[in-house]
Amino acid sequence: MSGSAGSGGTTGSARKRIMKEEDMTKVEFETSEEVDVTPTFDTMGLREDLLRGIYAYGFEKPSAIQQRAIKQIIKGRDVIAQSQSGTGKTATFSISVLQCLDIQVRETQALILAPTRELAVQIQKGLLALGDYMNVQCHACIGGTNVGEDIRKLDYGQHVVAGTPGRVFDMIRRRSLRTRAIKMLVLDEADEMLNKGFKEQIYDVYRYLPPATQVVLISATLPHEILEMTNKFMTDPIRILVKRDELTLEGIKQFFVAVEREEWKFDTLCDLYDTLTITQAVIFCNTKRKVDWLTEKMREANFTVSSMHGDMPQKERESIMKEFRSGASRVLISTDVWARGLDVPQVSLIINYDLPNNRELYIHRIGRSGRYGRKGVAINFVKNDDIRILRDIEQYYSTQIDEMPMNVADLI
């Protein structure tokens, strides 16, 4: 490898290639040259019992990110993978983690950090499902749950721990989570974690890991501050990145409804309710207060909705998610806590009651309404003073958001 020819493993030729890009706002880096494509799961050199789990789970053919990243991770390389929601990124690292385990050794060999409790639990469930024939032990280590239970589970021995950085670090500090056998650290939704809140805690966790630990970082967006951070704890990483303007929104029809004033949004939503319940819909608000207010108001008007935000107790959030997943509730009102990585395939309509506070969140909200290339519809409620933000989002993603047609129900 010629990784020494530049900072953080960017080779000279790669750096020249980056400089050639005229518009740096559109493009981060390109995929490393040595990344080849493995078109089927059968040709990845995976263990038999894992392959059985993959096919039993319903996967047939690897997605683009899986075709590129799994082989590199299994080889032991540090990997930065840029991949939006709905591309199969969770399965990418889950399959790789399962392949690298020594099931005979009942110690933690892989650690996966995620920004929200829900996402950590979803990762854990995915690992248990994919590893169904391997007899894998996997625990979700998350805040808001019983510490004693965590300690008991960890003492029993877990091959993989998925969790939120705060609780994971707490367990390492208490010596309940032993790090000596850890071979791999996965940072999922890294942009969100390294944002503000979890940066310090990730560093704290990282300091306790064996020096040779392999690091895999997965993220929908890669702001430069993340790429700088990867230099600190990755060695000559392979980059598997796509140009930003190819990053999803494909197959998702995006519309806006002009509402002059905030008060008009509610009536607009009520008019749309019959359309919402054709399949399942998620409605995003920017604040917890707004979620509670809107839920209350919808129920007063005799509409059936459920709601979720970060202030709710863990148990309550879990039962709401379960209800929504099973289809028992059709409309979920939420803050951005829902926008990251939560997988409900039936959701084919997203409504931004409020436009997101930052444009990078837009893709996290919308990118899930058309999972795995399925079609979806996104409707943005836009007040007069939001037009500017909408245009900014359009430009940022090189996409088009048209006024909502009358026959929107036919598109869902």
Swiss-Prot record:
It comes from Gallus gallus (Chicken). Residues 251-412 form the Helicase C-terminal domain. It is found in: Nucleus; Nucleus speckle; Cytoplasm. This is Eukaryotic initiation factor 4A-III. Its main location: nucleus. Keywords: ATP-binding, Cytoplasm, Helicase, Hydrolase, mRNA processing, mRNA splicing, mRNA transport, Nonsense-mediated mRNA decay, Nucleotide-binding, Nucleus, RNA-binding, Spliceosome, Translation regulation, Transport. Residues 1-11 have a biased composition (Gly residues). One of its GO terms (molecular function) is ATP hydrolysis activity. It is an enzyme of class 3 (hydrolase).
